[in-house]
């Protein structure tokens, strides 16, 4: 079925606390992590909004693909909201248990998603952000991309599936990332398979334009 932009659906939908932007344009669902002041670190509300919207679009025949991105230009996602998780643990609450369980379920949903998922990994992609993108079908990095698992610096193991995807990287690079918490750029991400396409960040608006006019 062909769809010109003039006839394409453009639908904006409310998201929890506006921390997730939700939009459908030209049969493509766009999900934007919208906490730029916190480098788009994800909290439980955001995890639930992402999962709910992905589940809705999975059964919506008018949505043919999904794009994930972060707002602000500095980060796709800097990981989980560590402050809220730490405070929960210190106060004897179980937010941290609920968060990690549902975050893992969200990542698994993306790995098993029935429709193509494009992840725009512009800026920081750390910890939980790595978990979000590794299940995507197309993972795009830019000259601003920095990938890593910084949670190991506070004594935590590489989570969100890190023990799976890091162990499969060539040349022992995954072990190095998982032990040191170091960050890598676009070229290294492409080399080791953590990304499969690169473009200049200045071209991202052009990519949006092309998606809005894509015939499907």
Descriptions of predicted regions:
Residues 1-69, 108:
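Conserved CoA-thioester-binding segment of acyl-CoA-metabolizing enzymes
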Residues 68, 81, 132-133, 188-189:
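Hydrophobic/aromatic residues within transmembrane alpha-helices
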Residues 70-105, 155:
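Glycine- (often His-adjacent) and acidic-residue-rich active-site loop
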Residues 110-154, 181, 186:
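Glycine-rich beta-to-alpha active-site loop
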Residues 163-172:
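Hydrophobic, secondary-structure "cap" segments at the distal end of domains
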Residues 200-216:
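Amphipathic alpha-helical blocks and their helix-capping loop/short-beta junctions
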